[in-house]
Each structure stands twice: as structure tokens, then as C-alpha cells.
UniProtKB/Swiss-Prot annotation:
Binding-site residues for GTP, renumbered to this chain: 18-25, 82-86, 136-139
UniProt name for this protein: Elongation factor G
Alphabetical UniProt keywords: Cytoplasm, Elongation factor, GTP-binding, Nucleotide-binding, Protein biosynthesis
Source species of the chain: Dehalococcoides mccartyi (strain ATCC BAA-2100 / JCM 16839 / KCTC 5957 / BAV1)
Biological classification of the source: Bacteria, Bacillati, Chloroflexota, Dehalococcoidia, Dehalococcoidales
Single Gene Ontology MF annotation: translation elongation factor activity
Record Pfam families: EF-G_D2 (PF22042), EFG_C (PF00679), EFG_III (PF14492), EFG_IV (PF03764), GTP_EFTU (PF00009)
GO (cellular component) term, any one: cytoplasm
Length: 693
């Protein structure tokens, strides 16, 4: 245990999260400047941001990986993670939220709540992360505070608690009014200077009182102390109101709302104050639940330096200068550089080499780290995303991080033998870093196939492979990751018999198969009676069944959501072996699937397009031509928001086509929604194409 510079109650582990282009990275850059972590303000358009440090991020002006940094404000230690807003990089948000205590959700004051805002909100709700909201870009034409509040209530089903209102809007935006004391704040100025203040304009007094009354009423609905004072007609002092706001925020009963413009330096200092005032410290979060890897019993760890060490690895980065960096969140105990740790996920001892506190891609070496901290380490060779690190004498296995399955793939071929070696190494490192990036080698075609969450996702990873690992490779066109399923019950026998002199081969298994609900996955049931098949042979048959389902039966795509019941079989004392039963299992499942009315499932994407009203008809027409289904059309003051679904197979090239249809004036976001049955005629074309390979 070490002497802390900042007590645990003054530590904040927070994420800056939002839709792409809402201003997350700009907000983070202002925070770094105001907390004196940087001496000049980074600019996305100039590619000078601290947090977007990868070449692909600077070139594209978007955040791809979750960059971590530490900052200090008003006697508090802040660990800040800036997460990507593009849906293809949702995994980065997922793993960040798993280890954070609180979130700052940034909204674009013009666009309001956008598609990825909803996705991120759902992710944060799933992990129970308390949040505060910052309505950004209040200086932009079309910014509307009240409309954004309405969208937070309607689209996110969240109870908002306005703690500020904007004074002015668009070009007249002066700053904001604090509804606790009616003080008004303008420019943040430099780190050393106080925030500019001004008097509440007389014309805004009535509006400010209305919003304050709303805030008190909403607070009273969720907090007993405020309700008592409210019913008694008493005015609570500001400190008691702030304590009540903190209580409802930590309980996720209501969301404090702030506003400003990060780009114009208004509202960020007060936002930092709010992070310290209302978001949780590691002491405020519930004890981490886990299991004893030896007994399977439920155990927990409280946030304390005196409890046994436990941590969750949430990110792997291949640093070109120092090697393999593993980021982890310490939930209990402490760890020193050079000490040992136990990876309970893999049952292996690991050595903590150097301990590092990260500032985007800059490294600060430290001697030790305590409960509640987010740090990185060099030297962990066999630790991967989602693994638990702990004290071997008091082991615990924490809940892993769940990631979505990839929906798109493409083939990649190295130009030379030396490129093959570099490509293999590069793909392995990229797959270690990104759990939604998968690599498979196709034995039949001899191709390496990579899988990801979308076109941009694979584009960025291929760019990194070519530039960081100096690989010269040919890249194929993106392809859809279809799935196979069955729609009927069927029964079949698989009998593998070989006799060619000497000892033969004999395996015989009978199975029944039936469809399961979407997302239920694969299930195997042993209903073999009277020892007709010995246990080890049945397991071999099941292995053959599973392998065949994974490679596909109908069109060469993985088969999902199927229940397999082994009902009968036979074996030979001399000729039966596990390999023969593996072949029999494969034969049985192929025969059964052929009778079970197989279908193809295709990934369906949820799409949100924002377009000027005059192009609305063209955008809808284009979506209809792609087998799209329109869910809603919502007009707003300057644009129309079209929400719908479209098959992934029909979405390739949509960026270019939308730009063409709207003369570059529309934007869109797309995310995976579900797998659905593919229309028969189109499915037949895919099956026939697969048969010609």
C-alpha cells in the first residue's frame, strides 16, 4: 500500500462519450488545456489534438481508439477516457464503460440526440454508469437547448435535471446561467484566470426562474430531503441541493444537464466542477462481484487498498516504441512495478514489468498503482482484453467484457513471402488490440479473411496493417458475413465405415435437430440410451457436428441457433475410434440440415440519415431501392432525420451514393441491428455463388 497524493473520494474515472462530431475530442482538449496537461489547445481540423494521436485519427478527424489521460482539477485526480463516436468502433466504447465510474455525454446542440447517442446511452445504462450531459455547440446556428432536452426525454427515456440554461443562442450566445444561484458565466479564459461572469439579463430572469422551479420539482420527485423542504415551502441551501443532485445522479434517477461551446471556450470549467461535484468516486461504486476460480463461489472486492489485488485488463496496444501495453483498471489492493500477478482467466502467473500512467500516447512511469486507478503495464505477455489480474493467494475471476460479433469481411493477400510473415504478425497484434476484429485462414481458397464491424472499421485496420507493419498486400472487396439457420425439425443418421485390410474405421450416430430462437445459439443434448455409444465417442461425434456447423452446411457460412439431440448409434469394439465418430457426426448433421429447410440470415443495419428537406424524397427512394424499410421521418428546423433499416449487403458504397444524391449535404450513421431471414430468390443466388467457388 502507498501514500496517496489524492484520497479515493477525490478520484474520478470518467469517459467522454457521444455521437461522432458532437465535440467529444474538442471538449477533452479544452479539459487538458484548462487542467494544465497541455500548454496549447489542440485542434481537430489542424490534426494537432493530443487525444487523437494515431495517424488514421489525424487523417480522418475522428477518434478511433479510446485514449486515456490523467488530469487534476480542484484537488481531484481525473482519469479521462475519450471514446470514439463512430458505430464501427463501438467495442472501444463498450470496454471503456466497463471500467469507468462515470460518464460525460456530449450532445450537439444543433442535431440533438443522434443514433450513436442512443447506442452509447444504452451501453452506459447496461453498466449502470452515472452520467452528466453537456449540450455543446450552443454558438452554432440552429442550436436549440429546449429541443435537445426534449429529445433526451423522448429518445433516451431519461429524466433530465437542468442545472444551467444558455444565455443567448447561436451568434448571440454569451454563456450560461447557473440555476442554483443565478450566476452567469462566459469565457473560461486561461487556466489561471477565473471564468468571466456577468449579470443575468432582465429579459432572461423569468425563463431562469421557470427552469429552476422545474429543476427543484424534478429533484424533489427523486429525493426525500428535497421533497420535505419543497412541501414545507422551504428553500434549501445550495450545498444541500448539490448533495441531493449528487445522490440522484449516482443512483441514475436523473441526469444533470450543462451547456456551452467547447470550441469557443465557454462552459468547460463549470463542467469540470460538475465532474468533481456529481460524478462518483471509486468509493461510490458497488463492490465488484466475481467468482472464486477454484470453487465457483460468488465473491466480491470492495474499493480499498487493503483488500487483495484485483484488476480487469480492458485494452491491449502494440506501442511501436516500447512494445505490448496492457491497460487495466484496479478495483482493489495495489500493485508495484516489477511485482507478480496472477491471471485467473488463463490460470497463469504474470509479471508486471513497468507501470505507466498514460497521457494519450505519452508515458509517465510510476512505481506503484492503487485501487481505483487506470494504468498500463509492460511485461504482461499472456493477458488479453477482459482478463482478470489478481493476487494468487486470494484469486477472483471478474465478469468479462462482451463484444458484438463481426458482420463484414474481406480477403487480404500478401504480395511476397516476407509480406506473409509481416502480415501474420501484424494481424495477430491488431486482433489482440481489437476483440471485434477476427482473422481466419480459409484452407480451401488459401486466403486470409479478416472480419470487422463495418467498412470504416476494416478500412482503418487495413490502413494500419499496411503503414505500421509495412505490409504490401492486395485487399479484396468487403463481403457480408451471412449466417445459416434451419426452420424445421429433422432426423438423420451418419454412418462412417471404412474397411481396407487390417483394422477398419467404424462410427455410427443418429441425431435430431430443431431450430432455436434467434440469438439462442447452439445446444447439444445427449439422449443416447443404454450406452449405445461410449461417452468419448459421443463427444467426438459432437466435435464433428460443431466443426461442420461452424464451417457451414448450406452455403459455407456458420450455422446458428440450432439444437442437436443425439438419440442413438452403434460402435465396434475394434474398429471404432474418435476420428471415425467425428466423421459420422459430420455426416449426420449434413444429412439432417438438408431435410430441415435451411435458410440464410443476413445482417440488417439500423440507419439514420440527416438530410436537407429538399432531398428527403431522393434519400427515401434510394433507401427503398436497397431493400430498406423506413421506420420514421422526423422534420427539424433545417433538416429531416430519416430512420430505417437496410441489409448490409445493400449498404456498400452508400457513403458515395448519399453524397451524390444530396450534393454532399447529408450525413448518416449506421449500426448493426440484427440478423434476419434473407428473401428466397436472393438467398438462392448467394448459395449458388458459394457453390461455384
Amino acid at each position: 500500500m502507498s501514500d496517496r497524493k489524492y484520497p479515493l473520494e477525490r478520484v474520478r474515472n470518467i469517459g467522454i462519450i457521444a455521437h461522432i462530431d458532437a465535440g467529444k475530442t474538442t471538449t477533452t482538449e479544452r479539459i487538458l488545456y484548462l487542467t494544465k496537461r497541455t500548454h496549447k489547445i489542440g485542434n481537430i481540423d489542424e490534426g494537432t489534438t493530443v487525444m487523437d494521436w494515431m495517424e488514421q485519427e489525424k487523417a480522418r478527424g475522428i477518434t478511433i481508439t479510446s485514449a486515456a489521460t490523467s488530469a487534476y482539477w480542484n484537488g481531484h485526480h481525473l482519469n479521462i477516457i475519450d471514446t470514439p463516436g463512430h458505430v464501427d468502433f463501438t467495442a472501444e466504447v463498450e470496454r471503456s464503460l466497463r471500467v469507468l465510474d462515470g460518464g460525460v455525454v456530449v450532445f450537439d446542440g444543433v442535431a440533438g440526440v443522434e443514433a450513436q447517442s442512443e447506442t452509447v446511452w444504452r451501453q452506459a445504462s447496461r453498466y449502470g454508469v452515472p452520467r452528466i450531459c453537456f449540450i455543446n455547440k450552443m454558438d452554432r446556428t440552429g442550436a436549440n437547448y429546449e429541443r435537445t432536452l426534449g429529445m433526451i426525454a423522448e429518445r433516451l427515456k431519461a429524466k433530465y435535471l437542468p442545472l444551467q440554461i444558455p444565455i443567448g443562442c447561436a451568434e448571440t450566445f454569451r454563456g450560461n446561467c447557473d440555476l442554483l444561484d443565478f450566476k452567469c458565466y462566459g469565457m473560461d479564459n486561461s487556466p489561471e484566470e477565473p471564468v468571466e461572469t456577468f449579470d443575468l439579463p432582465a429579459a432572461e430572469k423569468e425563463r431562469a426562474v421557470k427552469f429552476r422551479n422545474m429543476m427543484i420539482e424534478r429533484l424533489a420527485e427523486e429525493d426525500d430531503e428535497v421533497m420535505e423542504a419543497y412541501l414545507a415551502g422551504e428553500e434549501l441551501p445550495i450545498e444541500k441541493l448539490k448533495a441531493a443532485i449528487r445522490r440522484v445522479c449516482l443512483a441514475n434517477k436523473a441526469i444533470p444537464i450543462f451547456c456551452g461551446t467547447s470550441l469557443r471556450n465557454k462552459g468547460v470549467k463549470r463542467l469540470l466542477d460538475a465532474v468533481c461535484d456529481y460524478l462518483p468516486s471509486p468509493l461510490d461504486i458497488p463492490a465488484m462481484k466475481g467468482t472464486d476460480p477454484k470453487t465457483g463461489e460468488s465473491i466480491e472486492r470492495h474499493t480499498s487498498d487493503t483488500e487483495p489485488f484485483s484488476a480487469l485488463a480492458f485494452k491491449i496496444v502494440s506501442d511501436p516504441f516500447v512494445g505490448r501495453l496492457v491497460y487495466f483498471r484496479i478495483y482493489s489492493g495495489s500493485i508495484s512495478a516489477g511485482s507478480g500477478a496472477y491471471n485467473s482467466t488463463r490460470g497463469e502467473r504474470e509479471r508486471i514489468g513497468r507501470l505507466i500512467r498514460m497521457h494519450a500516447n505519452d508515458r509517465e512511469e510510476i512505481e506503484y498503482a492503487d485501487a481505483g486507478e487506470i494504468v498500463a503495464s509492460l511485461g504482461l505477455r499472456n493477458t488479453f482484453t477482459g482478463d482478470t489480474l489478481c493476487d494468487q493467494n486470494a484469486p477472483i475471476l471478474l465478469e468479462n467484457i462482451k463484444f458484438p460479433e463481426p458482420v463484414i469481411n474481406l480477403a487480404i493477400e500478401p504480395k511476397t513471402r516476407s509480406d506473409q510473415d509481416k502480415m501474420t504478425e501484424g494481424l495477430q497484434k491488431l486482433a489482440e488490440e481489437d476483440p471485434t476484429f477476427k482473422v481466419k485462414f480459409d484452407d480451401e481458397t488459401g486466403q486470409t479473411v479478416i472480419y470487422g464491424m463495418g467498412e470504416l472499421h476494416l478500412d482503418v485496420l487495413v490502413s494500419r496493417l499496411l503503414s505500421e507493419f509495412k505490409v504490401n498486400a492486395g485487399v479484396g472487396k468487403p463481403r457480408v458475413a451471412y449466417r445459416e439457420a434451419i426452420t424445421a425439425h429433422a432426423k438423420a443418421q451418419g454412418k462412417f465405415v471404412r474397411q481396407s485390410g487390417g483394422r477398419g474405421q467404424y462410427g455410427d450416430v443418429t441425431i435430431e435437430i430443431e431450430p432455436r430462437e434467434r440469438g439462442a445459439g447452439y445446444e447439444f443434448v445427449d439422449n443416447v440410451k443404454g450406452g449405445a455409444i461410449p461417452r468419448n465417442f459421443l463427444m467426438a461425434a459432437e466435435s464433428g457436428i460443431r466443426d461442420t456447423l461452424e464451417t457451414g452446411v448450406y452455403a459455407g457460412y456458420p450455422m446458428v441457433d440450432v439444437k442437436v439431440i443425439a438419440t442413438d448409434g452403434s460402435y465396434h469394439d475394434v474398429d471404432s475410434n474418435e476420428n471415425a465418430f467425428k466423421m459420422a457426426g459430420s455426416m449426420a448433421i449434413k444429412a439432417a440440415v438438408a431435410k430441415a429447410k435451411p435458410i440464410l440470415l443476413e445482417p440488417i443495419m439500423k440507419l439514420e440519415a440527416v438530410t436537407p428537406e429538399e432531398y428527403m424524397g431522393d434519400v427515401i427512394g434510394d433507401l427503398n431501392s436497397r431493400r430498406g424499410q423506413i421506420i420514421s421521418v422526423e422534420p427539424s428546423p433545417e433538416t429531416t432525420v430519416i430512420t430505417g433499416t437496410v441489409p448490409l449487403a445493400e449498404s456498400f458504397g452508400y457513403t458515395t451514393d448519399l453524397r451524390s444524391v444530396t450534393k454532399g449535404r447529408a450525413t448518416f450513421s449506421m449500426e448493426f441491428e440484427s440478423y434476419r431471414e434473407m428473401p428466397g430468390e436472393l438467398a438462392t443466388q448467394v448459395v449458388e455463388a458459394a457453390g461455384k467457388k
